[in-house]
Curated annotation (Swiss-Prot):
<dbReference type="InterPro" id="IPR004521">
    <property type="entry name" value="Uncharacterised_CHP00451"/>
</dbReference>
<feature type="binding site">
    <location>
        <position position="282"/>
    </location>
    <ligand>
        <name>Zn(2+)</name>
    </ligand>
</feature>
<feature type="binding site">
    <location>
        <position position="285"/>
    </location>
    <ligand>
        <name>Zn(2+)</name>
    </ligand>
</feature>
<dbReference type="GO" id="GO:0002099">
    <property type="term" value="P:tRNA wobble guanine modification"/>
</dbReference>
<dbReference type="InterPro" id="IPR029402">
    <property type="entry name" value="TGT_C2"/>
</dbReference>
<dbReference type="Pfam" id="PF01702">
    <property type="entry name" value="TGT"/>
</dbReference>
<dbReference type="InterPro" id="IPR036511">
    <property type="entry name" value="TGT-like_sf"/>
</dbReference>
<keyword id="KW-0479">Metal-binding</keyword>
<dbReference type="InterPro" id="IPR050076">
    <property type="entry name" value="ArchSynthase1/Queuine_TRR"/>
</dbReference>
<keyword id="KW-0808">Transferase</keyword>
<keyword id="KW-0819">tRNA processing</keyword>
<dbReference type="InterPro" id="IPR038250">
    <property type="entry name" value="TGT_C2_sf"/>
</dbReference>
<dbReference type="InterPro" id="IPR004804">
    <property type="entry name" value="TgtA"/>
</dbReference>
<keyword id="KW-0862">Zinc</keyword>
<dbReference type="GO" id="GO:0003723">
    <property type="term" value="F:RNA binding"/>
</dbReference>
<feature type="domain" description="PUA">
    <location>
        <begin position="577"/>
        <end position="652"/>
    </location>
</feature>
<dbReference type="Pfam" id="PF14810">
    <property type="entry name" value="TGT_C2"/>
</dbReference>
Length: 652
């Protein structure tokens, strides 16, 4: 069972429950040799860092001594590890030696027999760039074996969870086909296989394409494991694209060659030995100097280097988790991807899929949008803004520029005249920023240095396209001034207050509907005495009473509905827009203000994004409650564990 606890980009901090044991993802699974005598770092030290390890069931099965212990005492006793143990099936040996002496069903039976927590099918790891015919044939065989493995597990009611490995070489349509078929077989975890040769050749862009094309077809409610990815420099980008699990033999293999891992690359101990201290504060690097480590006999040196490599690997995973919680994972990705040109190339390739990524990126975050380079202009936050700008409807649009010396939010630092015209500021980051909503995340919750000319012209095409699509509504400076004079004159009897117009534009931008003039004139706007920003929107009710419609949240200026606001959304938007439909079994819990759990969601607006404000209804579209969705539209339809909507309040 898997649930999302925090998220940013496509990355998620998840809680994965396996045989009563809890794993927090993303995490790394250190590769452990089943023979303790061949293990570089002791299992006792690994256990202090890892909640899950991965070892090789094929090696155990083909070694009589190890096999006997595993069959009699179980794999946890063999290795001396009480937490979750995942096993590979021999696919690695198949990729190295070309053949192995085990059958697909036999290795599944063996993994179950020795008490493995998560087993792996005997897939065929197709190498990159092979002939298409070979890739198709090997994928066909992998899928056949997958079907046999699932059938065996289900018929014999095996306890172990199963990995269904995605193959297809470097043919993206085959990766999608593999993911789609594996999804139909309902595996528990989905490793993406045969990417190690690509990473060894620094072909990170191909790895990224494989991840994203696999993710397009994989279920959102199951973890994804990037098989063989063990270098920390690759973790941030991979997590941002939805990978939850990694495995690392690199910590030990690199140590044997005298290589010292960092989060941004690999150093050689030989090149460090003249330094007084290591560039790290792990226990190994505090205890020893580079010169001391270099002079040690090889076995001890390898062990200590491997320990450092393991520490730095887990440190990067923990740093990524913190970035997800803080809402600045993209900033970490942009920092990491500048460690190597090929990694930057991979990031740029990922951003070619930004419309897909945007579906999973939260609409609001704790941290501001920080510009890290030209690639930032393609991030999901900017793509979403440009799409949602189309929601704001106006018959009168005026586009203007503003001095670079004026700080955001522009509306608080300029003296534009009030009117119902849609005033758009040309902006280097977002293309066009409506003056009336420029306090909304991320339009003012952002920062950037002065941009170069090539960066400034990035949005020219977008602006020109917008002008062309709205050419009948665009006003020049003369017509705009004339319009302003008329609008503000006493002769205009239909004038609506500027605050009400601002709220109307915010409603359109956030929810996609607008209020008419009569409804706008009834709005009561309350501003903060301290900041002078709008804080509450109220409407008159019976007698002299007033009810809160929306509250503007201070950190992102989004409209958070109160009960009357939820009623308004329900009234104005057709089913299923901004709705989460729940089972009648839990209607009363929702009415009582209890959180909605995923397994009770039966329908929803498929266009929802994480952290949107939604209304909760039954199948008859009766309004039950309102709150914040923790999942997007696709996830709401696929998750069956954990919270789906954090309910603010219900309707009795």
């Amino acid at each position: 069972m898997f649930e999302i606890k925090h998220r940013d980009a496509m990355g998620r901090i998840g809680k994965l429950k396996i045989n009563g044991k809890i794993i927090e993802t993303p995490t790394i699974m250190p590769v452990v040799h089943p023979n303790p005598k061949k293990q570089t770092v002791s299992i006792e030290k690994i256990e202090k860092l890892a909640s899950v390890i991965i070892t090789n069931s094929y090696i155990i099965n083909t070694n009589p001594e190890l096999k006997k212990i595993a069959e009699e005492k179980g794999i946890h006793n063999l290795i001396g590890f009480d937490k979750v143990i995942v096993t590979d099936s021999g696919s690695f040996q198949l990729s190295v030696y070309g053949e192995i002496t085990v059958e697909p069903e036999e290795i599944i039976e063996f993994q179950e027999k020795i008490g493995v927590d998560v087993g792996t099918i005997l897939d065929i790891p197709t190498a990159p760039y092979v002939q298409r015919e070979q890739a198709e044939e090997e994928l066909k065989e992998t899928l056949r074996r997958a079907e046999l493995s699932v059938k065996l597990r289900d018929e014999k009611n095996y306890k172990l969870l199963l990995n269904g490995t995605i193959q297809g070489s470097t043919y993206m349509d085959l990766r999608q086909e593999s993911a789609k078929k594996m999804k139909e077989l309902d595996f528990d975890i989905y490793p993406i296989g045969a990417v190690v040769p690509l990473m060894e050749n620094y072909d990170y862009a191909q790895v990224i394409e494989i991840i994203l094309n696999s993710k397009k077809e994989l279920p959102t409610n199951k973890p994804v494991h990037l098989f063989g990815c063990g270098h920390p420099m690759m973790f941030a980008l991979s997590v941002a694209l939805g990978c939850d699990l990694f495995d690392s033999a690199a910590y030990a293999l690199y140590a044997k060659d005298g290589r010292y891992l960092t989060e941004s690359g690999t150093l050689h101990l030989e090149d460090l030995k003249d330094l007084e201290k290591f560039p790290c504060s792990c226990p190994v690097c505090i205890e020893y100097t580079p010169k001391e480590l270099a002079k040690m006999e090889k076995r001890k040196r390898t062990e200590l280097l491997a320990e450092h490599n393991l520490y730095i690997t887990f440190e990067e995973i923990n740093r990524i988790k913190q970035a997800i919680k803080d809402g600045n994972l993209w900033e970490l990705v942009e920092e990491r991807c500048r460690a190597h040109p090929k990694l930057l190339e991979a990031y740029r390739k990922a951003l070619e899929y930004n419309e897909f990524i945007e579906e999973f990126d939260p609409i609001t975050k704790k941290s501001a949008f920080f510009y890290g380079g030209y690639e930032s202009l393609y991030r999901p936050e900017i793509i979403r803004h440009k799409k949602r700008l189309e929601r704001i409807k106006s018959d009168n649009i005026y586009i203007t520029t503003i001095s670079n010396d004026i700080n955001r939010p522009y509306s608080e630092n300029t003296n534009m005249m009030d009117s119902d015209a849609l005033v758009l500021i040309k902006d280097d980051l977002f293309g066009l920023v409506p003056l009336s909503i420029d306090t909304v995340y991320p339009l003012s919750q952002c920062d950037n240095p002065k941009l170069y000319c090539y960066e400034k012209i990035h949005n020219n095409e977008f602006v020109e396209e917008f002008k062309q699509n709205n050419k009948d509504k665009i006003m020049d400076i003369t017509s705009y001034n004339y319009y302003i004079n008329h609008y503000t004159s006493n002769a205009n009897k239909n004038k609506v207050g500027s605050d009400a117009i601002r709220i109307n534009n915010m409603i359109q931008y956030q929810y996609g509907f607008k209020l008419n003039d009569e409804e706008l004139k009834k709005l009561i706007i309350k501003r903060s005495k301290k900041t002078n920003r709008i804080r509450n929107v109220l409407i008159p009710t019976d007698g002299n009473n007033k009810e809160v419609l929306f509250t503007l949240r201070s950190n992102d200026n989004l409209l958070i509905p109160a009960k009357e606001g939820a009623k308004l959304i329900h009234e104005k938007l057709p089913f299923p827009k901004y709705r989460v439909v729940i089972d009648s079994e839990v209607e009363e819990f929702a009415r009582d203000g209890k959180s909605v759990f995923s397994k009770f969601v039966i329908n929803c607006d498929k266009e929802l994004r994480p952290y949107e404000e939604v209304i909760i209804v039954n199948e008859n579209d009766e309004l039950l409650a309102y709150g914040t969705t923790l999942l997007n539209g696709k996830e709401l339809g696929e998750f069956n564990y954990g919270a789906a909507v954090s309910v603010r309040s219900g309707f009795k």
